[in-house]
Amino acid sequence: GHIFPAVSIANAIKTLQPDSEILFVGAEGRMEMQRVPAAGYPIKGLPVAGFDRKNLFKNIPVLIKLFKSQRLAKKIVKDFKPHAAVGVGGYASGPTLKVAGSMGIPTLLQEQNSYAGVTNKLLAKQAKKICVAYEGMERFFSKEKIILTGNPVRQGLTNSTISREEAVQS
């Protein structure tokens, strides 16, 4: 999913810059609206939803939600005034990073998968850098923008006191 890598990125930023302010923007009614506050971060919701690739007529309400999300994202970005915007490929990344980029705010994408998601592919052109987990992502993104970082991992997973043998037995 997108939530835990995003929280891991936020945690890393807070470790490096403890006084930094971080605001998440998520899709209303989705898991991030509970998980992000549980991780200690504020979140604003957008009514955005994914497109139905099989039945185009079902996308009329989705388009209306997208336009509304674009307007709300603009207000959120204007009010928060971020120095940068990071997208991890979730539905809310689209309108939020599109608006941030159009306002001259540097955008960064993080792609967790070996096959790039639709949102990240659409945002790639305006992104300043694209962090990827796998080699060979040049087939989706400009080689000059790619940074091979691997996937962000939650601190609790990397600081485990469980041995490899115990983990395999679980």
Model-derived regions, located:
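Glycine-rich, highly charged phosphate/nucleotide-binding loops
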Residues: P61-K78, S160, R164-E166
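Active-site-proximal region of nucleotide-activated glycan assembly enzymes
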Residues: M31, P42, G101-V168
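Alpha-helical segments flanking ligand/cofactor-binding loops in enzyme cores
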Residues: N11, Q34, K98, N120-K121
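Glycosyltransferases and closely related glycan-assembly transferases
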Residues: L72-V86, A92-L108, K121-Q126
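Short amphipathic alpha-helix
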Residues: H2-K14
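Residue-level signature of catalytic and energy-coupling elements of molecular machines
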Residues: G1, V36, G89, S114, ...
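Conserved nucleotide-sugar phosphate-binding/catalytic loop shared by glycosyltransferases and other
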Residues: T15-K65, Q70, K143, I147-R154
